């Protein structure tokens, strides 16, 4: 209390000083005295602030807790908002109360202006925005620091004007602040904001006495001096303020009209949110702190009519009231209860949640608006581009007519005359100028558009520049007709430069096309200069266009007509589609049009054909008929000698296996099984519904089982719809069986297992005319037991491969369990059950896959050379149909081969395609069939890749490109070396098998061919005699060798190995290689020197000279008989050749590293013998004497006998002997 009394006494002294200062200023002589008291007043205020700081902090904390404890919420919202939100409201409320008393009005104006200064924390003249109120404690300091001035006449008017300007600034800045807060403010910032506002209110409440007193003093002073002129000035000021406010409102209205609808909504929502937040905050602050509104303050202030004594009394009363209020506040400061605090916290949490929700909604709405705007802009852009493209295309057409020489202006005629004159001049000089026809026609190259050549880019650039000029002309003509005569100065100069450059080059003069391009560019320049000429030219163009269109209708179907058709199609599609799908359609058409700009005629035709092929494929895929099924393709896989071909022979009633070389299948074969044969084979099956068989037959593919033919097994499995895996019941799963299982797994191909050779079970009684399940029941107990035992063992082996298996008559779920069918190819048991199961599974589970489709799908299986027919290809036709005369594209070794079908040959039903039969010739073949195709240039065809049919000539390049992609992988496998053997086989499949074997044996191959061995093949192989005679060999697999070719090979020294079984060929060739190697080793035995490093054992010197016999330790390498030795430390003295090596009195050929041996070194013939102790000593290391020839001989013929450490020693010795 003592502190407070002291403060009060200081305040009273302060007031006296202020009054004196004001009086001095009014009289006009107190200008100098004014500053000092004001400064002292500022200092005292600071002191007071420091003293009250602790109390203020406590007040803040307690008021935060009692946010919602008071019950009053919405009553005082308007009152609390009005003094802070708008200056307009303040003025209106003032006007109402000021009507009665002018003196009172003046005092209130002064008072209010001072209050505004305190609230907004303004300095003497500079206006600060209201937003500064957000900055908590800094604001309080400013509030206390502000010096108080007495108000003269001029000051009053200025202050009022400043206040209005400041209010406008404040309102704008508050809006900006609210926007920032709504977009990116967190909950914590809003709390800070609330606290700062509360702090300001507290300050206002805590110091009402001094403010009012100072206000009264000013009022008294100003009331005494006020004149009529001042009143008039104030009135004018108010009117001016009103006018400014009206202008500001009009400006805001205009801005709002300019904003788009989306932005309006956004700003409104933000504004409403901001007001709501401010109102809630203000209402809570007023309830908690009890701030006296402006109206109440005005009511409390005394009238201006009273004299100074009355004012003093009032001041004293106010001080008393202030003391009472402080006491009341202390009582309040005791704090709210825990329940109140909890309620307040919950309310705060709810408020935060509400703010976050509003923020999220606002963000979503903004995002939606942005997306809609982007979509609208994209649509506009696409529309614009479409229009531009149409214009551009029209210009292109006119340009083309001009380039063709149908429209010639005066300048063009002159240019042509010049070009003709230069041509004649060149011809007179004897230069041969090639004409267009004489030049060889360039083959069109289809490349990526990124890889364009520079001239093409330049051409397209010129064309685009000319198009831009044209477009500019049109714009000028349409938009600004006055400026038609004045062309832009830069562009024509550039065009003229390009013309001059073109004329300087005599090659450009010689080419008609390039001169026409230059002329075409000229036309566009002249068009701008002469608009009258342009109109005449346009009329001529229209006439020429009509004639051009007629010519195009008659002749050129691939050119502009195709483009027009494409346009029509795209227009129809666009008109039919909905609004949502439009952008994507336009995008795709954009890319087409853009690419048309710089494409050649061939490229346009290419794209047209590509589109046609895609459209046809799409139509075929839609028109799939599930009612009509094609024949399923069934592949037979398994290990060697499991009886694959024998099973098929039993089905076909043929003897193919007996006719094969060694009974081994080495080619892929196909058999067509008709429906009649299926019914015949399955007659013993009782529950087989023969009436409702939907498949027209079956196409069975037989594959080789040998290790080398993995390529053929792979090819066969990739074609088939379902497979038969043949397993020998006596041997179970074997290596190639497991390989086949993995192939089928990778291709996701369903299969059934034939447990073959059940006739080899002891005491088996055959019964081919009954079901195999019934046959098994009839067998003796020991036979049944053996069968069950072996079947279970095989089921376990399948489980090890990750497959569930069960006997077919016990299999309830064929989708998860593989069916095992016991069969015997010899007796015929189980064959009917096998066929029945295949038919059932294909009809039920594979009906979608077997649905009839017109889209051609065919694969080349084998390439064969047949006598009398030339090279033929065996094709499996999976879908669609083939006709005689069709243009086919097949993969070749040197690229795709285009040829025509000269003949379609089919083997008779139930006959093998690969076996020479009396083939039936057909004009048309439907799927699924194994077909032999006769045609031209099929020698270099590659098997295992698709066959394609071109229905129109322009489709050929498209289909070629498709095949090239698939060809790359196959061609990478066949890589020819510079040095190597020559390989020939009857089919590509067996050739691949042979090449695979050579690759694993590390034998290079330099040439391959399919078909019989001719003289030309021997000539090619004989080239190797010069390079490497060991590779002058022809490996002929399953092919005939012509007599003259054999004679030529004998005379040249070329070896021909021929065999019908691939393994025999392997054996013969490996034997030849070994013999050749031995022969060469004998030949190079004396040249090849093996590296060695030996140390002398001095205690074992048996003979020191001629021959030297001593004990040595082999430190590195290997010592062999015949190795020349030398001593590098004694100037490389040669001591002789190792003629004998002994270990424990036993003679050996080689001594390896680490062994201690006795060696006999004899002197080199013709040289004087060297002596131990004279020419070399025990400390010297002996090494073998190597040379470049010896190293080469080791590399070529003794590589197998060398180890890695030996090669390292050679490297070391090379440095010692300085061998390059």
Curated annotation (Swiss-Prot):
<feature type="modified residue" description="Phosphoserine">
    <location>
        <position position="135"/>
    </location>
</feature>
<feature type="compositionally biased region" description="Basic residues">
    <location>
        <begin position="146"/>
        <end position="158"/>
    </location>
</feature>
<feature type="region of interest" description="G4">
    <location>
        <begin position="756"/>
        <end position="759"/>
    </location>
</feature>
<feature type="domain" description="tr-type G">
    <location>
        <begin position="629"/>
        <end position="846"/>
    </location>
</feature>
<feature type="modified residue" description="Phosphoserine">
    <location>
        <position position="107"/>
    </location>
</feature>
<feature type="binding site">
    <location>
        <begin position="756"/>
        <end position="757"/>
    </location>
    <ligand>
        <name>GTP</name>
    </ligand>
</feature>
<feature type="compositionally biased region" description="Basic and acidic residues">
    <location>
        <begin position="170"/>
        <end position="179"/>
    </location>
</feature>
<feature type="modified residue" description="Phosphoserine">
    <location>
        <position position="560"/>
    </location>
</feature>
<feature type="binding site">
    <location>
        <begin position="663"/>
        <end position="665"/>
    </location>
    <ligand>
        <name>GTP</name>
    </ligand>
</feature>
<comment type="function">
    <text>Plays a role in translation initiation. Ribosome-dependent GTPase that promotes the joining of the 60S ribosomal subunit to the pre-initiation complex to form the 80S initiation complex with the initiator methionine-tRNA in the P-site base paired to the start codon. Together with eIF1A (EIF1AX), actively orients the initiator methionine-tRNA in a conformation that allows 60S ribosomal subunit joining to form the 80S initiation complex. Is released after formation of the 80S initiation complex.</text>
</comment>
<feature type="modified residue" description="Phosphoserine">
    <location>
        <position position="164"/>
    </location>
</feature>
<feature type="binding site">
    <location>
        <begin position="825"/>
        <end position="826"/>
    </location>
    <ligand>
        <name>GTP</name>
    </ligand>
</feature>
<feature type="compositionally biased region" description="Basic residues">
    <location>
        <begin position="95"/>
        <end position="105"/>
    </location>
</feature>
<feature type="modified residue" description="Phosphoserine">
    <location>
        <position position="222"/>
    </location>
</feature>
<feature type="compositionally biased region" description="Low complexity">
    <location>
        <begin position="20"/>
        <end position="32"/>
    </location>
</feature>
<dbReference type="InterPro" id="IPR015760">
    <property type="entry name" value="TIF_IF2"/>
</dbReference>
<feature type="compositionally biased region" description="Basic and acidic residues">
    <location>
        <begin position="7"/>
        <end position="16"/>
    </location>
</feature>
<keyword id="KW-0378">Hydrolase</keyword>
<keyword id="KW-0597">Phosphoprotein</keyword>
<feature type="compositionally biased region" description="Basic and acidic residues">
    <location>
        <begin position="434"/>
        <end position="449"/>
    </location>
</feature>
<feature type="modified residue" description="Phosphoserine">
    <location>
        <position position="557"/>
    </location>
</feature>
<feature type="modified residue" description="Phosphoserine">
    <location>
        <position position="183"/>
    </location>
</feature>
<feature type="compositionally biased region" description="Basic and acidic residues">
    <location>
        <begin position="323"/>
        <end position="334"/>
    </location>
</feature>
<feature type="region of interest" description="Disordered">
    <location>
        <begin position="430"/>
        <end position="608"/>
    </location>
</feature>
<feature type="modified residue" description="Phosphothreonine">
    <location>
        <position position="498"/>
    </location>
</feature>
<feature type="modified residue" description="Phosphoserine">
    <location>
        <position position="595"/>
    </location>
</feature>
<feature type="modified residue" description="Phosphoserine">
    <location>
        <position position="113"/>
    </location>
</feature>
<feature type="region of interest" description="Disordered">
    <location>
        <begin position="1"/>
        <end position="417"/>
    </location>
</feature>
<feature type="modified residue" description="Phosphoserine">
    <location>
        <position position="547"/>
    </location>
</feature>
<dbReference type="Pfam" id="PF14578">
    <property type="entry name" value="GTP_EFTU_D4"/>
</dbReference>
<feature type="modified residue" description="Phosphoserine">
    <location>
        <position position="190"/>
    </location>
</feature>
<dbReference type="Pfam" id="PF11987">
    <property type="entry name" value="IF-2"/>
</dbReference>
<feature type="modified residue" description="Phosphoserine">
    <location>
        <position position="186"/>
    </location>
</feature>
<feature type="compositionally biased region" description="Basic and acidic residues">
    <location>
        <begin position="517"/>
        <end position="530"/>
    </location>
</feature>
<feature type="modified residue" description="Phosphoserine">
    <location>
        <position position="588"/>
    </location>
</feature>
<dbReference type="GO" id="GO:0003723">
    <property type="term" value="F:RNA binding"/>
</dbReference>
<dbReference type="GO" id="GO:0000049">
    <property type="term" value="F:tRNA binding"/>
</dbReference>
<feature type="binding site">
    <location>
        <begin position="759"/>
        <end position="760"/>
    </location>
    <ligand>
        <name>GTP</name>
    </ligand>
</feature>
<dbReference type="GO" id="GO:0005829">
    <property type="term" value="C:cytosol"/>
</dbReference>
<comment type="subunit">
    <text>Interacts through its C-terminal domain (CTD) with the CTD of eIF1A (EIF1AX) or with the CTD of EIF5 (mutually exclusive) through a common binding site. Interacts with eIF1A (EIF1AX) from the location of the start codon by the 43S complex until the formation of the 80S complex. Interacts with ANXA5 in a calcium and phospholipid-dependent manner.</text>
</comment>
<keyword id="KW-0648">Protein biosynthesis</keyword>
<dbReference type="InterPro" id="IPR036925">
    <property type="entry name" value="TIF_IF2_dom3_sf"/>
</dbReference>
